[in-house]
């Protein structure tokens, strides 16, 4: 209730609510019971409790986005190791801080879309946002040695699998009257296919919303230059590249960017407050990325929101 009252007193117009976030399971959907009993066992809330929250958000006039982590799911891999990316011995491979269902496997597609449909029908979300819609990063050493099995039954490239999953999900979810979004790494604004299967034009061309995640503290330093100490310049450079990818896309999605709203996780751990976050927003607008933004701060601290009140009250 406090978050809703805060949002009503500013120009915030939407909430992003987790359906699932890796091993943090929002509520006890029967879809988990069917496809991933372990996830069902660890649900944090009941369906009724979640319905009440989303109803309050919607009744207050806000746009409700249901965020769903896709190919980062240790619980599913525990329940179905046969669909997990595996090592050379056939055992699920723990890489990039998780076990990963293979994006090549259609049963995984079926599960995630079934979960999205259930969320739309029971929670009345306006949009489903697929996060971790990619293969794991940092698999180079395994691929070089041949010590990894992606379960690639159809002989697809990674980028083909990601685009085809999103085409499948979008076609189905549009039948339920909702929009579909996809989160992509900041690197995806480059003019190449990434090693984890995200290619901006291929994704932007098939979903309704594409959300880059160009957090300045995720960029590599260049000598003594730390990008996270220069949020305006970092986002300006990134947005220029992202705008080019949008221009190359025949039917581009709406751009709605995730921006850094937390203190940097790299030295000198500089604070991100009204000035820094405002600089990020300004940079996006100057490069023509005007589809809106979402502010990422995993703590969801009300104290932090109050600190940022001048920024959110002044939004245009």
Question: Which residues does each PLM region occupy?
Answer:
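The substrate-binding groove and active-site-proximal loops of carbohydrate-active enzymes
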Residues: 32-47, 95-110, 151-161, 224-232, ...
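Active-site-adjacent "subsite" loops/lids of carbohydrate-active enzymes
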Residues: 43, 52-55, 65-118, 278
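Aromatic-lined carbohydrate-recognition surfaces of secreted/lumenal glycan-active proteins
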Residues: 58, 63-73, 129-136, 156-196, ...
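Aromatic-lined carbohydrate-binding/catalytic grooves of carbohydrate-active enzymes
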Residues: 10-45, 137-144, 305, 312
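Aromatic- and glycine-enriched glycan-recognition loops and surfaces
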Residues: 1-10, 37-60, 157-167, 237
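Substrate-binding cleft of secreted/luminal carbohydrate-active enzymes
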Residues: 207-221, 230-316
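Catalytic domains of carbohydrate-active enzymes, especially glycoside hydrolases
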Residues: 2-25, 120-130, 206-211, 283-293
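Aromatic- and acidic-residue-enriched segments that line the glycan-binding/catalytic groove
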Residues: 28-40, 73-95, 133-152
């Amino acid at each position: 209730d406090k978050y809703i009252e805060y949002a009503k007193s500013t120009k915030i117009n939407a909430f992003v609510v987790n359906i699932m976030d890796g091993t943090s399971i929002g509520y006890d959907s029967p879809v988990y019971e069917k496809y991933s009993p372990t996830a069902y066992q660890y649900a944090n809330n009941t369906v009724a409790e979640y319905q009440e929250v989303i109803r309050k958000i919607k009744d207050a006039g806000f746009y409700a986005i249901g965020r769903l982590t896709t190919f980062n799911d240790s619980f599913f891999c525990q329940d179905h190791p046969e669909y997990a990316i595996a090592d050379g011995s056939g055992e699920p491979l723990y890489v990039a801080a998780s076990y990963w269902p293979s994006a090549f496997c259609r049963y995984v597609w079926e599960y995630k879309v079934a979960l999205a449909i259930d969320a739309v029908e029971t929670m009345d979300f306006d949009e489903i946002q697929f996060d971790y819609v990619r293969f794991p990063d940092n698999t180079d050493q395994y691929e070089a040695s041949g010590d990894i099995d992606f379960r690639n039954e159809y002989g697809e490239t990674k980028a083909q699998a990601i685009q085809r999953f999103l085409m499948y999900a979008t076609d189905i979810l549009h039948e339920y009257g909702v929009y579909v979004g996809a989160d992509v790494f900041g690197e995806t604004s480059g003019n190449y296919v990434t090693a984890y299967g995200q290619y901006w034009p291929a994704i932007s061309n098939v979903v309704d919303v594409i959300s880059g995640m160009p957090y300045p503290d995720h960029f590599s330093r260049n000598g003594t230059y730390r990008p996270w100490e220069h949020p305006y310049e970092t986002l300006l450079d990134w947005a220029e590249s992202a705008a080019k990818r949008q221009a190359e896309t025949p039917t581009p999605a709406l751009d709605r960017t995730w921006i850094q709203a937390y203190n940097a996780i790299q030295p000198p751990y500089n604070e991100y407050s009204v000035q820094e976050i405002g600089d990020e927003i300004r940079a996006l607008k100057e490069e023509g990325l005007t589809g809106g933004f979402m502010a990422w701060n995993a703590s969801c601290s009300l104290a932090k929101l109050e600190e940022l009140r001048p920024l959110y009250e002044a939004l245009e």
